[in-house]
């Protein structure tokens, strides 16, 4: 039975039991900052299990794409060396949200395994939690599993409820016993049943885990029965495929064998058992699907995990002798295997291959050099020894070797790595970076009052606000005097505090004779706004009542740029593709600067398309709408959650024209308020990240007017109209090319004429003609032509010509005819003269060039040539 058929039969079976088939969630958890990657089927249902969210169904089934690499769940170092470790795997699961419980879950599992997949019942063993008599009885009396094949597992991890058969989401919250199903590979394979001393052997392999969430655990460890118990099950597709296909290693199943053959094809390897092929076959799955879900290789977070996996695959390709990009060529093979089950892979295949190829080319430049450094270092380390932390860090910092990649190589050679030394070197670098950094917000502002009430969405002026706290030089004070720089915390404010890329507001705080100029607004902690500025007059004390007034003109320019950013983000996705995701932004009164995931520069046509789309939305003058709702409802409604951002349970959804994003910033009331949108710059800021700068409103109008003025000025200089300027410029360019050609011909004639005059000045040294001369300001190219001409005229000669320009720079050209290069070399001659005029030179035996900058020394240097030649003849 093929892997694709196993997956399909699983989903269809549970669909027939009233389950809704739910598509795989992204590998990037949508709303769980505690997880680096989605690593199980229950992740997308976490809030349903905890009661924070409800769905339209109470039964679900899915095939969840999962990754375990980096963070707590990290299988990377074992991949390729064991039968069942993977970075990427598929978790088949069925779930009940307060619907059925143990009886149905157990019976469904048994029916699928024995009647649909037709596994021999006598090959199946099960485990239950020691105290879970209900599950034990269902297995024994209702399903009919012999009691000798039902094993109770107690608290085998050192504390109460710490057991392989007791699951808990965290220290507190939903938890409960679980029942695991094992397959017996038979007595020919070493190992014992679960719970025995030999349980780590490969004879009994876990294929399915049924989790029964029936308790709520509090901080004191007390267990309270849940009013609606739930079921969460997980069965690895790769493991069940190995069982159903009669193989012992996951890498022997059809899906992996096809990828291994593809890897062998691209690396030229014939031994399909090579572990490096297994590594490559595993890693292409993880890398491709991470890119599909918006992760790109980088030096931090999820992007760095992806980079580590890619580079580990490339190192194994290098080990197999492949030094050219090959990894990206496996994408079509992966699409053939998994594209039908996951259409998103097929849709993004070209993009995936492009990202992988670029990463291969980037790392390929340093891989060979890094391997030479590592090989040299390991040559001096005996088996069982240790590679020093300094070398580890050099490979990481200079050659881009992730430390686990170096450790992988060392392990193959039975060498340990000095992680303590590496960590120390890394810490030193971080300390240096911190020392060099400058932080905008003073650290250590302690505030224990209520959060600031923000009213700046509707108001730019707010009277009657109270001073809640004052800070001078980081210290909390009761009063501020005129002339002092301070931070003011208010109970309420119309000032927006810098967040989400939008700069903070400026303006005034006034009361009687007190006037505080706000230069910036920043959060001193979550929910607390600090107004930074200087008290221009009067005094200010805690408890004072003020009028807070935002600089309305500056705010208006800022919100125009912010709203335009949303429209531009949407337009970029339309023009370039759905892979475009925000990587950073800065919105201030002057511009919007937007960083996004994309690999290639934008063409002029693409920029024009984006501008046209945004300005069409501006002209439509649609009203904007902001709503507060649950995060999951927002995402279901099509709101874009920005990559890498963390959101609370409740979010603000902003509709601007055709854009819908989660955003807490300030915006225009109607799209027409943006006025005009213009992109003024585009470039790269990092690997796979582009930056666009754009302006709006009066800034955009001023830019257009300035460009028009430049156009009119240029047209006037060429005595034409702006409309005819391109044609006129083409004419001027053609005229320039003709003049340059004529000039070149004139220079050639001049050189020939000068050569005729110089030839007569050649001296004879031991029967050899020697000519050395300084000619004033002559182009180096013309100088070389003159040397060639003189060599032809003199037939057998040594020639050195020099020119000194008005800027003091000296050009030297030396030539030696072929019959003399055995005794006199042009490169040596030019080097000798250049050394006397403060420069360097060199070249071939028959022709060489050089230069210098000491014009005063040039006459003596030229005069020394005859003596130098005489010494060599």
UniProtKB/Swiss-Prot annotation:
Under InterPro entries, the record lists: aa-tRNA-synth_II/BPL/LPL, Ala-tRNA-lgiase_IIc, Ala-tRNA-ligase_IIc_anticod-bd, Ala-tRNA-synth_IIc_core, Ala-tRNA-synth_IIc_N, Ala-tRNA_ligase, Ala_tRNA_ligase_euk/bac, DHHA1_dom
Q: How is the cofactor bound?
A: Binds 1 zinc ion per subunit.
Q: Which domain of life is it from?
A: Bacteria
Cofactor names? Zn(2+)
Respond yes or no to whether keyword tRNA-binding is given for this record: yes
- Single Gene Ontology MF annotation: aminoacyl-tRNA deacylase activity
The listed locations are:
Cytoplasm
Q: Which residues bind Zn(2+)?
A: 562, 566, 663, 667
What does this protein do, in the record's words? Catalyzes the attachment of alanine to tRNA(Ala) in a two-step reaction: alanine is first activated by ATP to form Ala-AMP and then transferred to the acceptor end of tRNA(Ala). Also edits incorrectly charged Ser-tRNA(Ala) and Gly-tRNA(Ala) via its editing domain.
Its recorded name reads Alanine--tRNA ligase
Organism of origin is Bordetella petrii (strain ATCC BAA-461 / DSM 12804 / CCUG 43448)
